[in-house]
Amino acid sequence: VFHQVYDVWGFDLVKLDFLYGAAPFGNASESRAKRMKRAIQFLRDISKDKEILACGVPLMPSFGLVEYSRIGCDVGLDWDDVFYMRLLHRERISTKNAIVNTVNRRQLNGRVFMNDPDVFFIRTENIHLTDKQKDDLARIQALLGGVFLTSDSPANYTDDMIRKYHEYRKLASALVTDVNTDEGITIEYVLDGKTNVIHFDCTNGK
């Protein structure tokens, strides 16, 4: 499979998902963590100098072995999923939780791999996030993440959406100088030589 993807098709990067499936259990001679580390090392060895975006993977076993890694849950098309999913599942799709993961795991970015906080949205179709929720998601990902991707189809963007996309892309080049989470999320950053401070209240995204 990897020969086909790398050598025949010519891809230089693969996204490998659901990697936690390599180590659902340990045994008396090998812990889950050790088994997971061995699996990631195997993927690293066969990928050689090709880049890996790991997803659905325990973070620590992949330190230093992949170029990029998802560092939280999937974002959703709404803010925090439906109520019964919140009652039944600790690990689930949640835009709110994805933002919290992006903030709280920001220190890993550029140290053990580049953080992938999942995608952001600008589109208005097939989405139940408010404009502010979409804007907060994109800005936090741009400032604190290491991978900045959208699942939108840019072909459907209006001129205003294109302008907003370029604004977010520029924000991704900012230098973050301080992050405070005592009351909400406050991020201080420098862009074009100017210091800026923005505040987010991610309790309900309003």
Where on the chain are the PLM-derived regions?
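Substrate-binding cleft of carbohydrate-active enzyme catalytic domains
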Residues: 1-24, 35, 42-47, 52-54
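Active-site-proximal structural scaffolding
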Residues: 7, 29-36, 133-136
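Extracytoplasmic/secreted cell-surface and envelope-processing proteins
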Residues: 22-26, 61-64
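Composition- and surface-driven signal marking solvent-exposed, interaction-prone regions
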Residues: 28-32, 154-162
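Glycan-recognition surfaces
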Residues: 41-157
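Carbohydrate-binding surface patches
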Residues: 131, 135-137, 141-149, 180-206
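Membrane-embedded transmembrane-helix bundle of lipid-linked glycan/lipid transferases
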Residues: 167-170
